[in-house]
Regions:
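Glycine-rich phosphate-binding loop of ATP-dependent small-molecule kinases
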Residues: 1-217
């Protein structure tokens, strides 16, 4: 049984790795976005409360999010442990999570931090292009068109979404780095942070994270 949080900047592959680890170790992958949608669909009191905040364009309060998380980890599919993705995002949230878990005789055991050089993050995040004519999606790293910025399928001119453009991506990375590094320091002070090399084949990265989990299992 392991309770962990997966840290990493946008483009580090947290979603892919969390899914891989969850399948390999039979633990629950908890994405806060998915948790909100599931609780709302199930009509739980906290889920409906969270939906009310989101429908008004407001942030869901920490106590509601943590309450939903505690409800979620008490379900049978979390019996073998869980991996949090997307929460906490602040020291206040991390501290509140620690207190809440302690009240349920649980604690975060380890925090793998997927580390990827910024130039590779930029390449991953700015590499997506799409064809407005046939909706085909390309990526300069994983699925490059035969001719730059030209669609293989219909020869249309490929375009890049505004949120995939370098200036926007750089701002997003800078914002996320600030809170991610703050959290990393928080968990490092608890001796729970474990940096993981996030370069190379995704299956190799999964093996690195599994090795970290095996150390404390």
């Amino acid at each position: 049984m392991v309770y962990c949080i997966l840290l990493g900047l946008p483009g580090a592959g947290k979603g892919t790795q969390a899914s891989n680890i969850a399948a390999d170790r039979a633990i629950l992958h908890i994405s806060t976005g998915d948790m909100f949608r599931e609780a709302s669909a199930n009509g739980t009191s906290l889920g409906l409360e969270a939906q009310g905040y989101m429908s008004r364009g407001e942030l869901v309060p920490d106590d509601v999010t943590i309450g939903m998380l505690l409800e979620r980890i008490e379900q049978k599919d979390a019996a073998s442990g869980f991996m949090l993705d997307g929460f906490p995002r602040t020291i206040k949230q991390a501290e509140a999570l620690d207190v809440a878990l302690k009240s349920h005789n649980k604690q975060i055991d380890v925090v793998p931090y997927i580390k990827v050089p910024e130039d590779l993050l930029m390449a991953r995040l700015t590499g997506r292009w799409s064809c407005p004519d046939c909706s085909e999606i390309y990526h300069t790293i994983t699925k490059a068109p035969e001719v730059d910025e030209i669609c293989d399928s219909c020869t249309g001119q490929l375009v890049q979404r505004s949120d995939d453009q370098p200036d926007t991506v750089k701002t997003r990375l800078d914002t996320n780095r600030e809170w991610t590094e703050t959290l990393a320091t928080y968990y490092e002070n608890q001796n729970k942070l474990r940096p993981v090399d996030g370069t190379g084949d995704p299956t190799v990265i999964t093996e690195r994270i599994i090795s970290v989990l095996d150390e404390i299992s």
